């Protein structure tokens, strides 16, 4: 799946 990457 996709991982959340907070920028």
Swiss-Prot record:
Lanthionine-containing peptide antibiotic (lantibiotic). Active on Gram-positive bacteria. The keyword Signal does not apply. Keywords: Antibiotic, Antimicrobial, Bacteriocin, Lantibiotic. One of its GO terms (biological process) is defense response to bacterium. This is Lantibiotic carnocin-UI49. It comes from the Bacteria. The keyword Lyase does not apply. One of its GO terms (molecular function) is signaling receptor binding.
């Amino acid at each position: 799946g996709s991982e959340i990457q907070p920028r």
